[in-house]
Design a protein with these regions (language model features):
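Generic structural signal for hydrophobic
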Residues: 41-46, 71-73, 93-95, 117-118, ...
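Conserved N-terminal beta1-alpha1 strand-loop-helix module at the mouth
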Residues: 1-77, 86-89, 124-127, 131-161, ...
Length: 208
């Protein structure tokens, strides 16, 4: 079954869960306007469909925003929660909240051993490759090729891997090539558009 998965960028501020559009430059994520209280209705999504919630403060400061985790409530949705993950303990901390999947940014994880440990302890964690200017952000502020990063994760055993095109530089033929190599790959695009249409992906994430 094909899934369109909406993504929201959230923060816990002033005693409320709030959200707003963001600007992304490399690994830096910042709100482009003041976050507003989230007006959410379960009717907006199909029953039990995933909803991606990005922890903007956690991604920015390099650690989980536990106030967002404990206060966000999205009845009727399976929450996919993306925050800074450095080690296995961070993954366990995320599962203290009411979430279905932890999304693990490839560039925030300390090393490849942690990736292997995460794969061994849970099947509910999905790596996320942040792509900027056509390359994947890597640890220590470096970069690597998309194919290289995918191969590393697939050798560990991951099949569902999110490729987050943060600056919309990937073209339709890029996505088609990635799908041919990794059919279970999940594109994450900044807006719904033609770049991933008709290629055959089973899930696509897009900014709400």
């Amino acid at each position: 079954m094909f899934m369109d998965i909406p993504a929201i960028y959230s923060v816990y501020r002033g005693g409320k869960v709030k959200a707003a559009p963001v600007n992304i430059e490399g690994a830096d994520i910042s709100f482009v306007s003041d976050p507003m209280p989230l007006e959410y209705s379960a009717d907006e999504l199909d029953d039990r469909m995933p909803l991606l919630v990005a922890d903007v403060r956690g991604l920015g400061k390099g650690g989980l925003d536990d106030r967002l985790l404990t206060n966000m409530k999205f009845p009727g949705s399976d929450v996919w929660f993306m925050t800074c993950i450095k080690d296995v303990e961070d993954v366990f901390d995320c599962f203290m909240g009411n979430i279905a999947k932890v999304l693990m940014p490839y560039h925030s994880v300390r090393n490849g051993i942690v990736m292997e440990e995460v794969y061994e302890v849970t099947e509910n964690c999905i790596p996320v490759l942040f792509v900027s200017k056509g390359v994947v952000l890597h640890r220590n502020e470096g970069a690597t090729g998309i194919g290289t990063a995918l191969s590393e994760l697939e050798r560990i055993g991951f099949r569902e891997i999110i490729v987050f095109d943060t600056d919309s530089t990937l073209r339709s033929d890029d996505w088609a090539s990635l799908h041919e190599k990794s059919p279970d790959l999940i594109p994450f695009v900044r807006s719904k558009g033609a770049t991933v249409d008709g290629i055959g992906f089973q899930k696509v994430i897009f900014d709400l």
